[in-house]
Amino acid sequence: MFNRIISLFLLLFTGQVIALDLELTQGINSALPIAINSFGSDAAAQEIGNVIENDLTISGQFKIISGPQGANSQSSVSTLRQLGADSVVTGRVNQVGNRIEVSFTLADAVANGNILLTKTFQINANQVRALAHHISDEVYQKLTGERGIFSTRIAYISVQRAGGRSRYSLEVADADGHNPQSLLVSSEPIMSPSWSPNGKSISYVSFEKKKAEIFTVSVETGQRRLITSFPGINGAPAWSPDGQHLAVVLSKSGTPKIYDVDLSSGSMKQLTFGNSIDTEPRYSPDGRSLLFTSGRGGSPQVYRLSLADGQISRVTFEGNYNARASYTPDMKHIVMLHREDRQFNIGVQNTGGGPISNLTFSGLDESPSVSPNSRLVLYATRYQDRGVLGIVSIDGRIRMRLPAREGDVQEPAWSPYLS
């Protein structure tokens, strides 16, 4: 498995996704009870209500309370309070010329319906889902005090197989998996997507010329830039927090090692040395260190490289396989791929050390990517013999599966905040 991960350029991934459907597999009793009143009967109004419900469910922080008439119905705040709701979102949608006017109110059902938040927006018809995600962010922040992640995006690799041929694509979608767009399509493998800190570009590995090359691509324009194209391995690109550098894995001098590429000048600096294979670099959010996977201790483990003095220290000691590690944005935890008893699951460890706790338990999990608010981990897994995406909370109490309607989905990457 270690060779399979460190030699990313050899992998042939399969999968294709059109949209993702939320399926909650585990929840918590402490979720905040909230009701979403219908925004209206037309398609736009129904979509807004559905998106908000879906978003708040994905967060793991809310329990949706339905009115007497079920979802997408209109009930009084007092009625919804009797059904257990602590908060109520109410809205309306009106046509104003060629624009759509959307208003919403967040009320405290416990405090006699006191208004906590109310806003009105005018949008174009193609902005309905985006506005619904924005409303979810507003509601989430008002009730939790933390910034919402519903207007962020995810990237992933998908492959469609037909007639003995494969079609690889780099997809970008909303955080809930809807609104997928193909940035790149190729008959050769694409892998290792990684978002730039400003969310405007994605780095990735391409085999379109029958060899591994590292590119960046603009999410808005699709314009590409070739970063490295050396003989052998060009893999595992990861952005520095300031967006000025990429850490990459190159084997141009023999054994795969980690290099820093200055994106302005193109100059490179080798960061790791020796005879061991070093791979999967990830910058710390403060830019002071790198996490990476290495076999220098005899088995694949996670190490930390200080960028100030080049000192390397081992991070993981539990088990004989830990890889693909990254910090949560708040730097409180390290999320990784952890193997025990031949089962590959997503694990988490406190940044200061200590035991590794499993967040998932399917034994077929990989490619963890942390949400920008540090609360959720997006990962790839298998379900009913297909590649799908899963989400697990950083404390392991919330687990969700987002099965694709068609094909497989793999190598997800969660964007940073986009505004």
Curated annotation (Swiss-Prot):
It is found in: Periplasm. Keywords: Cell cycle, Cell division, Periplasm, Signal. Its main location: periplasm. Pfam families: PD40, TolB_N. One of its GO terms (biological process) is cell division. GO terms for cellular component: periplasmic space. Part of the Tol-Pal system, which plays a role in outer membrane invagination during cell division and is important for maintaining outer membrane integrity. The Tol-Pal system is composed of five core proteins: the inner membrane proteins TolA, TolQ and TolR, the periplasmic protein TolB and the outer membrane protein Pal. They form a network linking the inner and outer membranes and the peptidoglycan layer. Belongs to the TolB family. NCBIfam families: propeller_TolB (TIGR02800). This is Tol-Pal system protein TolB. It comes from Legionella pneumophila (strain Lens). The gene is tolB.
